[in-house]
UniProtKB/Swiss-Prot annotation:
Start-end of Pro residues biased regions: 869-880, 941-952, 1281-1291, 1320-1334, 1425-1440
GO annotations of cellular component type: nucleus
Compositionally biased intervals (Acidic residues): 810-819
Compartments where found: Nucleus
Disulfide-linked positions: none
This protein's record includes keyword Transcription regulation: yes
Biased composition, class Basic and acidic residues, residue ranges: 1052-1070, 1080-1148, 1155-1180, 1199-1215
Compositionally biased tracts (Low complexity): 655-666, 767-800, 829-838, 915-929, 969-989, 1037-1049, 1242-1252
Protein name: Mediator of RNA polymerase II transcription subunit 1.1
Subunit structure: Component of the Mediator complex.
Organism: Caenorhabditis elegans
Major site of localization recorded for this protein: nucleus
């Protein structure tokens, strides 16, 4: 917008409005003085409704204080007002007062008295840091001249030497240190001569006066010394001191203490104070420090110096910081006959920029001050020697002529200058090195003899160098005596040969004027600039600059004076190479809306650099091998696995066919011809050959004999989010290549956008979707069969019809983890597709296991992306290795699991699940070898073979356990049906299975069940701490067969060999795909480390909770003890009263007491008497008795060690009957979860029976303790009249028989004595008897692994191979009857694998923890759905007998390392907090 500029300001409304506004501001400023400024700022903020947080408010207040301290003092105000403003500027703690003779300013650090006579300031006295007042003539002169602002700034600078943040004691220590330092420096650094400044220990110290701090002058240049000597001065006066560099000492707050000396009259530093400050050495101007010097001072400095900028030491002093190579210098001696010196500087020391320009340095001890001054002198002299070369090589003359010069090669180092030149005696070298700090020595050496020509000559050169501090002046004495070879050169002083600029070389010259370094352009360049009148203005500074059109000079370029372009002396060669002028491209497409992948734009910066080098490398890569082409791509920021995938492609058949195969972009509808097409012409590259042209992305095509690419991605791990999903699913989109289009301006290596859910699909037609899924499965099946034919025999040995863990086609081998989706072909009919693969029929059209049909977080793209986007890899790649599959699947499945829980809200019908469950259980009885029944195959849409088997141990959520069982049975039935169809009708298409009367589950319910099956595959595998010891496949089959027998409702009939033969024949026709192996050793080691960390964290948490619980127990014990004491007192009083009665009344009272005790004991023994009855009655009665708790659940007892031996005898006397062992193997076939409402009517006998059996077959210690049957009973050691009744008949398998997996060799330490809780217990081997008492309520679920996350039992040992995910607690912990808990499962004797172990308790009283705490307890009790056996909640006597008979014996158990029993009856209880 152009605003008209009016000449007549009277009629310009804008000017009038501006004047009115300014006048309003002036009037407001007059009304608001400084004292009301803070109030007006606050009112202004409130009017604008802006509220400030506490931190911002402090910043505002600090800003106001700073402004108040630095506002200029009004010169027109009165003297009193000026002094008042002076006091306000010295800080908020200043007190201003008016006296008869003048004014007084009091501050904790300064005191100022100002005398006034006849309205004029007559005297001024100032005292700093508690010292007495002294006259301040400098301050008086400033006040008389009206320079109050300058006086305030000077006083503030002195006061700032002490930080305001330190405490009062630290401030006093700093003041003492200042006094001690002043005393030392005044004594040892009082000589102001130039010699003392350069050689003294501390140089020269100028003490502090009223206007400045003390200063230490440490170096003086010889040039300045010669000027003073010409004036007849040998000492530095005030005029010369202002020209010398100096340092000032102050203090700075630090987090570590420093040693500060204490002032004494003798001046000796014998005592020191510690204060959290460091000594700040402030330079008067920036000091150039090399990296070597900083390292040398690192052991005496407490923190790094305050750096203004990082530079290169030698380039910074030249004034031409852009020069990094080919630096040539020529001296400019004034006389015509003088021989010049031409230096060719080595470029090694010109590249790095690790030197600094420091403003402040810090010390931690005042005694290191002398060493710092010595180092600063040495650094200054080294810089002065290099500056002597630069200064003499400047010239103000513009003409060029030939001069005589000696060529010298100069190598720069921090400790020396190394010169090499030719003489008549051969090549000579000269070393100018620092023998001691600030003391340089010259040494010449002949290259022929290796010795110095003359030692006296070297001594003379050394004296000249130390007196002049000039290398060129010293070399003038050596050139004549050494007879150096002289060459004729042009007198261009400094020449920069820019090898990257091919047009011209920029020659610049140095000029010397008043010893100030100024860079001037050469006369030739000036004349060239005058001839060129054209000036180009560019909007984009950088790559858009065209160097041939931009020619200007600094001095006569008025248009660009002060602009950004004026800072460029010439165009950098980088901009010449990267310029895009003349090579413009069409505008890119607009990008999509930003999402969480927007940060991936940074990746395109590196890949954009490779586009300019693609034209030549593309042609070379087509002729080179494909591995070399992949290596080229690896250099262009591509992962190694990606490059290997690129290299696996074969040469294209014809570029024309490849170009014709890409009719549309990635977001268009495409029709795909049948069959596999060859890859495009430029397979290994992502960018087009010509960057100015855009090409459509071509799809990868497969030739008949071509192997698919080996892998994609990086390192076998996927990232997070939908970008990683796209990278896993469509990794071939980049690796298959084609001249890739860059749609929406995105980088080709960036993951695709987030996919939408299936509900947002563009074409949700079910018929088209099912047709597309069928075609997709046909393609997958085609190449999968072709690849796996050679592995059939090997995989046949790994499979068995009785082994549900190793199906013919597992979910882990499906496309969900590693295979990209093949392109959709909706226009092609099924019959035409089947004609190309006649021998392998496709599956049914509705494939619920298809990776493209699912939820948004699946490890592949959503269906929304599939019908629209072509897959660049029509030829599916080679399957990943098992290790890659494991890493690719683990994290994506966890992410998708939680996304699925949030998305799905529909719950399946319980009645429908029961119907399907009953049908599946009836079919399992008909077919003994195959649990799933073919009659249930029509109750749900058919599933692919990819999800036909129960996965490894997983966790389930509530009702999803039943869904997962139904899914597993139906998928196994479908797999069997597919095997029969493939063997009989191999030439025909797979028929659609008929539908039965039962309505099928909804697709989202089936998907949910299948997804929940797939969630924790890898987690369960990784949960074992001994994952490097893997059981063989045959070892896994045995426990599976045992578990299948125990889960059936009746003993399954044996299958005849004649029936097994057809099944084996069918298996030969089944395509075998290897099951995913366990992760490699490194991955297992990382998993073990992670599990150890989790275990340690949970152990710490348990210990904390144990401490809190111990405190609560202690308080409870104290309370109980007091209550018992009160009861004893009351009893004692009653006894005394009764003794006064007659003997006739005393006898009946004793009888009543005995009867009362007997009745209580009888109630306590009642569960044991009831257990002696029949099986069905005993469990119902036990459950009935458990419903009448009379005491708190805190008082449940845990058996102690000393009762184990006598219980061994009782258990041996009573052997279980055959009916109990047979009955223990029976389980209800239904796996549907029973709700609490339904569980009230369900029979509870199987639940308690299984819980009793779990007691027998849980861990590996020798005996079953008796007190598990009545653990509420107090531990009575010597009480023969009250013998407990014989224990009830044990149910379940015979004691000692463990039907788990056979691997006794992997179970060390399983036969330890009972009660040892300090070492982890591995899973029990067979033929080992009962659990220890402390493990009964700890790892009740058989903890599938050692990690705290994987403490649930393997899912394959539950009903239908499922498990629950709900964090359920035992029914007695929830305050419910035993039958109203989670569904009952079979005993845990079959729940172990050879490589699993049970986590031991982490504390001797660990049984008190985590009951009823679903958020803090260990996962073994949080996640397991099976409920442990409820403790017998029988009322205890009010006053239980105290165990006092064997106190020593009881105390002995507490000290042992292997003891796990409680310390007291109160500690031996099972704590269950009902929350």
């Amino acid at each position: 917008m152009i605003i008209e500029e009016r000449k007549n300001h009277e009629l310009n409304l804008e000017s009038i409005d501006r004047d009115l506004r300014m006048e309003n501001v002036r009037q407001s400023a007059e009304k608001l003085g400084w004292e009301h400024f803070a109030r007006s700022v606050r009112r202004n903020l409130l009017e604008k409704r802006q509220t400030l947080d506490a931190r911002t408010r402090l910043d505002v207040l600090g800003s106001l204080v700073f402004m108040k301290e630095h506002l200029p003092i009004d010169n027109d105000a009165t003297i009193a007002r000026k002094v008042q403003q002076l006091s306000e500027g010295l800080g908020e703690h200043c007190v201003f007062s008016t006296q008869n003779s003048g004014f007084s300013i009091r501050n904790p650090d300064v005191t100022i008295d100002i005398g006034v006579a006849e309205d004029q300031i007559s005297t001024c006295k100032i005292g700093y840091f508690g010292q007495p007042l002294t006259d301040a003539p400098g301050a008086l002169a400033l006040m008389k001249n009206g320079e109050f602002s300058k006086l305030r700034d000077s006083i503030t600078a002195i006061l700032s030497s002490l930080p305001k943040e330190i405490t009062l004691s630290e401030k006093n220590a700093c003041k003492e240190a200042f006094r001690a330092l002043d005393q030392l420096l005044i004594r040892d650094a009082a000589d102001s001569s130039f010699t003392a400044i350069n050689t003294g220990k501390y140089g020269f110290y100028a003490p502090r006066n009223e206007l400045r701090s003390g200063r230490i002058y440490y170096v003086a240049e010889p040039v300045l010394i010669r000027l003073a000597e010409k004036e007849g001065k040998t000492k530095a006066d005030a005029s010369y001191l202002d020209l010398l560099p100096y340092i000032e000492i102050s203090f700075f707050k630090h987090d570590k203490p420093s040693k500060l000396p204490v002032f004494t009259q003798t001046g000796e530093w014998s005592t020191f104070n510690d204060a959290n400050v460091c000594i700040c050495v402030r330079f008067n101007q920036g000091f150039l420090l090399s990296q070597q010097t900083i390292r040398k001072l690192s052991h005496i400095v407490p923190k790094s110096p305050l750096v203004r900028n990082y530079v290169n030491f030698y380039r910074y002093m030249t004034g031409r910081v852009g020069v990094k190579s080919n630096l040539k210098l020529l001296t400019q001696f004034p006389d015509e006959g003088d021989i010049q010196q031409q230096y060719q500087v080595d470029s090694k020391m010109l590249t790095k920029e690790d030197d600094v320009v420091a403003m402040e340095m810090y010390l931690s001890d005042f005694r290191d001050l002398s060493k710092l001054i010595e180092t600063l002198r040495s650094e200054w002299k080294h810089a002065s020697l290099w500056e002597s070369i630069l200064a003499i090589c400047e010239s103000s003359k513009g003409e060029q002529k030939e001069v005589n010069a000696v060529d010298m090669q100069l190598v720069l180092r921090r400790t020396e200058f190394f010169l090499q030149f030719d003489t008549d005696y051969g090549s000579m070298t000269m070393q100018i090195f620092e023998k001691s700090p600030s003391n340089y020595v010259v040494k010449t050496t002949s290259q022929i003899t290796g010795e110095s020509p003359s030692l006296d000559f070297d001594k003379m050169l050394t004296e000249k160098l130390n007196s002049t501090w000039s290398i060129p002046a010293t070399l003038t004495f050596a050139i004549t005596d050494l007879k150096c070879r002289i060459n004729s050169v042009l007198n261009c002083v400094i020449s920069f040969d820019s090898s990257s600029s091919s047009d011209k070389q920029h020659q610049n010259y140095w000029s010397i004027s008043n010893n100030n370094t100024q860079l001037m352009q050469s006369a030739a360049q000036k004349s060239a600039a005058k001839c060129t009148k054209k000036k180009v203005t560019v909007l984009e500074v950088g790559p858009a600059i065209e160097p041939t059109q931009l020619v200007y000079t600094r001095e006569n370029d008025e248009e660009f004076q002060g602009s950004l372009l004026s800072s460029f002396g010439e165009v950098d060669d980088y901009y010449v190479k990267t310029s895009t002028i003349g090579r413009t491209r069409p505008q890119p497409r607009p990008k999509r809306e930003p999402n969480q992948l927007t940060s991936m734009d940074m990746m395109s910066a590196e890949l954009d650099k490779s586009r300019h080098t693609m034209e030549g490398s593309m042609r070379d890569a087509q002729t080179s091998s494909f591995l070399d082409a992949a290596r080229v791509r690896m250099k262009q920021s591509i992962g190694a696995a990606h490059a290997v995938g690129l290299a696996s492609h074969q040469p294209p058949a014809s570029p024309v066919a490849a170009a014709a195969a890409a009719p549309g972009g990635p977001m268009r509808h495409n029709s795909y011809p049948s069959g596999f097409e060859p890859p495009p012409s430029v397979a290994p590259y992502d960018f087009p050959a010509d960057p100015s042209k855009k090409q459509r992305k071509q799809r990868a095509k497969k030739q008949p004999g071509e192997e698919p690419p080996a892998g994609r991605g990086k390192g076998g791990k996927k990232g997070r989010g939908a970008g990683a999903v796209g990278a896993a699913a469509a990794g071939g989109r980049k690796s298959a290549g084609g001249a890739g289009e860059n749609p929406f301006g995105m980088d080709p290596m960036r993951p695709p956008m987030l996919q939408r859910s299936s509900s947002e699909q563009h074409n949700p037609n079910p018929h088209q979707m099912s047709q597309y899924q069928m075609q997709q499965y046909q393609q997958n099946q085609q190449f999968r069969m072709h690849q796996m034919q050679q592995q059939q025999q090997q995989q046949f040995q790994m499979q068995s019809p009785k082994n549900p863990l190793v199906p013919a086609y597992t979910d882990e081998d499906s496309d969900e983890e590693c295979d990209p989706p093949p392109p959709p072909k909706p226009q092609v009919s099924t019959s035409s597709r089947m004609s190309s693969v006649p021998s392998h029929p496709p599956p049914p059209p509705q494939q619920l296991g298809n990776p493209m049909v699912g939820y948004p977080g699946m490890p592949l793209q959503s269906p929304n992306h599939l019908p629209l986007t072509p897959s660049p890899l029509s030829a599916p790649p080679k399957p990943f290795s098992p290790e890659q599959q494991h890493h690719f699947g683990m994290k994506m499945r966890e992410t998708s699991y939680w996304k699925e829980l949030e998305r799905l809200e529909t719950k399946p019908d319980v009645e429908k699940l029961k119907q399907q469950l009953s049908s599946s259980s009836s079919s399992s009885q008909a077919e003994a070898s195959d649990p799933p029944s073919t009659s249930t195959e029509a109750q749900d849409p058919p599933k692919p073979s990819s999800s036909s088997a129960p996965p490894p141990p997983k966790k389930k959520l509530g009702l999803e356990a039943a869904i997962s069982k139904i899914r597993g049975q139906q998928e196994q039935a479908l797999q069997k049906q597919l095997q029969q169809q493939e063997s009989v009708e191999s030439e025909l298409a797979t028929p659609h299975p008929g539908s039965s009367g039962a309505p099928p589950l909804a697709p989202h319910q089936v998907n949910r069940a299948r997804n929940l099956n797939d969630i924790f595959d890898d987690e369960a595998d990784d949960s074992s701490p001994t994952a490097d010891i893997k059981p063989s496949l045959q070892a896994l089959q045995k426990p599976t067969d045992t578990s299948s027998q125990s889960t059936s409702s009746e003993p399954p009939p044996k299958k005849e060999p004649a029936d097994e033969q057809p099944e084996r024949e069918k298996e030969k026709l089944i395509l075998k795909i290897p099951k995913m192996l366990k992760p490699v050793v490194d991955d297992r080691r990382e998993d073990r480390k992670e599990r150890d960390r989790d275990r340690d964290r949970d152990r710490d948490r348990d210990e904390d909770r144990e401490k809190v619980r111990d405190k609560e127990d202690k308080a409870q014990r104290e309370k109980d003890k007091k209550e018992k004491e009160r009861e004893r007192r009351r009893q004692r009083d009653r006894d005394r009263t009764e003794q006064k009665k007659s003997d006739r009344e005393k006898e009946p009272s004793k009888k009543r007491k005995l009867e009362k005790k007997d009745e209580k004991e009888k109630d306590r023994r009642e569960p044991e008497r009831k257990k002696g009855k029949s099986d069905g009655k005993e469990y119902s009665k036990a459950s009935t008795t458990s419903l009448i708790p009379t005491l708190s659940l805190k008082n449940f007892r845990i058996p102690k060690k000393d009762t184990v031996e006598e219980e061994k005898k009782d258990v041996k006397e009573e052997a279980p009957g055959p009916s109990s062992s047979t009955e223990s193997k029976k389980e209800p076939p239904s796996a549907a979860p029973i709700t609490r409402k339904e569980s009230t009517t369900a029979p509870v006998a199987p639940a308690v029976q299984q819980q009793q059996q779990r007691k027998e077959s849980f861990t590996a210690l020798p005996s079953l303790p008796e007190q598990q049957q009545h653990h509420r009973e107090p531990l009575l050691k010597k009480k023969p009249p009250l013998q407990p009744p014989p224990p009830p008949q044990m149910t379940g398998p015979p004691i000692g028989i463990y039907p788990g997996p056979p691997a006794p060799g992997n179970l060390p330490g399983s036969s330890r004595p009972s009660g040892n809780r300090k070492q982890p217990l591995p899973p029990p081997p067979p033929m080992i008897r009962g659990p220890p008492p402390d493990q009964m309520y700890r790892d009740r679920s058989g903890g599938g692994g050692g990690s705290m996350r994987g403490g649930f039992p393997p899912a394959s040992h539950y009903h239908g191979g499922t498990s629950g995910v709900n964090k359920q607690v035992a029914s007695y912990a929830q305050g419910l009857p035993p039958g109203m808990g989670p569904p009952v499962v079979k005993p845990h004797g079959n729940n172990y694998q050879a490589s699993q172990w049970v986590r031991p308790p982490t504390h001797r009283d660990s049984s008190h923890s985590y009951h009823g705490m679903p958020s803090l307890g260990p996962p073994q009790l949080q996640r397991e759905p099976p409920a442990p056996p409820p403790p017998q909640m029988i009322p205890l006597p009010k006053d239980p007998p105290v165990l006092r008979e064997h106190p020593r014996e009881h105390r002995a158990h507490r000290g042992g390392a292997d003891d796990d029993g409680p310390d007291s009856p109160e500690e031996g209880t099972l704590r269950i907090d009902d929350e």
